[in-house]
């Protein structure tokens, strides 16, 4: 195949697709260039798998060379995918998966490799486009194409594929994907936006998606391959009719058992009895394994059909609830002692239960994220764990999988919208959700438990957040939207639409579907039902704890902050860390200073924090013109006196400024050690301060200012002491993570120009010129 190139302008950037040049042994491969982002996508198909699921694998490979960076770590090589790469792979998988035929069981692998990265041209948008197109032009049976975009909401307007700067000013971060007819994937974080604004964003995003799909269709028409004939998994129709006729009523009764474990036991017993009958019947048949495989599919289909029939026809759910009814709710705080943990929340919804535990720490414990974007510190972490005992099973127990990472990220987006700013609450925050029981919607239970833990721990969140999962049963013509879906409804339903938010608005959305798409009408109905349910859950949360506690747990570290001018960082640190060492030794605190001048002080002793803050405030204090001080005389010269205003800040009082009458000698007015009242008259561009005593005394009536020769300061030798030195230590080594371990200072030294500008040395004996 010869190289083909296709281009359009999309959302302010050029989108270029190249085919036929690279990865030609894959079933389908494309190079997508969006802005300066380049993604290679290759799609391949393997043999038919033996399992009862579609083995689709989507990878998003972040190569550090794409951003001109070296990988971290000892080996200097990319290892396991980052959290962001894992989430992006899930984001692509979810809209693609429903576009394969029922019964398709061949292995399909889609690999997206980021070759160059432009932060203002989304790699995930390019990779989603490339994944769909690689499948669409290949011979792999794929009922696409699909596409996805990002949507921001800025000053009342929707922006498609926003730049980094636009994202920073946006109140919405939305990824939406779909086919030409409908939306089939949503992922969003939002700053308490209304249902109407969110629905508008979804529709704006889908309109943009249609443009990308039309572009793909043009490419497929020119370079697409004929689709391969692939065997789909079909069951024996005669066997299916026989089993339904004989056993459907038994399975219907089992499905209608309301309690989860009892229902599972009942359906399992019915299925095992049927399998036993047919195992004996076809014991000597060489196709026994195929018969039993078909039988398992038939029984699953019978259960699937009965659950959907109950909901759509009888308007009864398997557990007996109404269509819009929430399961029984319970909320509790302080599940573990506050003397040990910093805050806990236990949230139960029916047979789904999550325990969330809060941990607070200084910002030096924040997670450092180093990916294709610039390195940054991640202050808030929400981790989700799903042990197998939560569903009464045994299984793998180890590092979190893609599902756990995804559910944790959803909770993180929902809760981070209401967190206080770093200036308001200078802590790194970690929430860990342990799912203790699960019968559907455990990710939303973790959000509710997280809200309880934050409030119990004294984190001043703006408002409590609750989450609910909405479901859908649709036959293509009629549909039913379900509130608070349980596991069975999730498994056999068509949609899992998670909505989290406060009373003011939505903070997070996530939608996965098993059908080709969802109409705007269904989305609007689901959002409206979710709002009603969310308020009911918030009632329970607020009845448990109405407001965040005013005090942190006794076990939580105490932190206070003070903003210091960037040019004063050197003063607080001192030469070689001498000054900050002195503060630490005196108070016993730990101190962290960032490049912006945010100085965090932490200790278990509040009085120690207060003392350290007082010392630092004094060190960075600056004199201002017009201020009045009680100042101590620290040096006397023939032309005037030097007085100490505070800390290491001195001022010079010229002899002519000591009184309105002529002063012959400084000693006639003051002596060393005297305390005099002075007013700041001038501060020059080098920070030298002139003060006056006479300015605080009323000018005598009839006073005439004598003529004086203008006084000029010399750049190289100041009149005061013959040099340009500052008494204050001006080392500007930036200090981070400084602790009071004996002699062990952990701080980062950045190259700064060394200043030795000591002004007014107290012990100088050099006479002025």
UniProtKB/Swiss-Prot annotation:
Catalytic reactions of this protein: RNA(n+1) + phosphate = RNA(n) + a ribonucleoside 5'-diphosphate
Organism: Lactococcus lactis subsp. cremoris (strain SK11)
Annotated keywords: Cytoplasm, Magnesium, Metal-binding, Nucleotidyltransferase, RNA-binding, Transferase
The protein, known as: Polyribonucleotide nucleotidyltransferase
Ranges of biased composition (kind: Low complexity): 736-746
EC number from the UniProt entry: 2.7.7.8
Biased composition (Basic and acidic residues): 700-734, 747-769
Cofactor(s) listed in the protein's UniProt record: Mg(2+)
GO MF, one example: magnesium ion binding
Chief location category: cytoplasm
Alphabetized SMART domains for the sequence: KH, S1
PROSITE patterns, per the entry: KH_TYPE_1 (PS50084), S1 (PS50126)
SUPFAM superfamilies the record matches: Eukaryotic type KH-domain (KH-domain type I), Nucleic acid-binding proteins, Polynucleotide phosphorylase/guanosine pentaphosphate synthase (PNPase/GPSI), domain 3, Ribonuclease PH domain 2-like, Ribosomal protein S5 domain 2-like
Binding sites annotated in the UniProt record for Mg(2+): 490, 496
KH domain: residues covered: 557-616
UniProt family annotation: Belongs to the polyribonucleotide nucleotidyltransferase family.
